[in-house]
C-alpha cells in the first residue's frame, strides 16, 4: 500500500502582501525569565516577529543576559572580555585541588609501566595445563610417528 496521495489545492493569494505587523500567525509564547539579581520578567516570542525567527533578528540573540550583550558589543569592537565572577574562582580552585590530588596519588614521578629489558622469572609465570605438558621420552617417538602418519594420511 502506498502513502497518502498529494493534491494541488489552489490557494487564493492577496494582490498585495500584508504588512508584517498585521500578519500574525499564532499566539505568542510566554516564558518567565529570572536574571542574576532574582528579578522575574515575562518574555514573549512568536507572533510579532513571525513563528520562525529563531533569533535571527539583529541584536536580539541574547536580549535578557547583560553578560551576553557585553560580550556581543565587545566582539563588535574586537576586544576580549573575561567575566570575573565567583564561578571562575571556584573553577580555578577546583583545578588546582585536582592537580594536587593527582600528584599525591601518583607518588612523584609518573609510572611508565613494566621494563622489558629482562624477562620475568619462571616462578612468576603461570603453569601450563597438564595436557600441554609433553609425555615421557619413551613413547614420544611412536606418538610423533602416529601424528605424522595421520597428518599425511599414510597407513603403514
From Swiss-Prot:
Primary localization class, coarse: nucleus
Region called Disordered, residue ranges: 1-32
Gene Ontology biological-process entries: nuclear-transcribed mRNA catabolic process, nonsense-mediated decay
Keyword Nucleus: yes
Entries under InterPro entries matching the protein: PNRC-like_rgn, PNRC1/2
Residue stretches of biased makeup (Basic residues): 19-31
Annotated localization: Nucleus; Cytoplasm, P-body
Keywords: Activator, Cytoplasm, Nonsense-mediated mRNA decay, Nucleus, Transcription, Transcription regulation
Gene Ontology CC terms, in alphabetical order: nucleus; P-body
Positions of short motif SH3-binding: 117-123
The protein, known as: Proline-rich nuclear receptor coactivator 2
Species the sequence originates in: Salmo salar (Atlantic salmon)
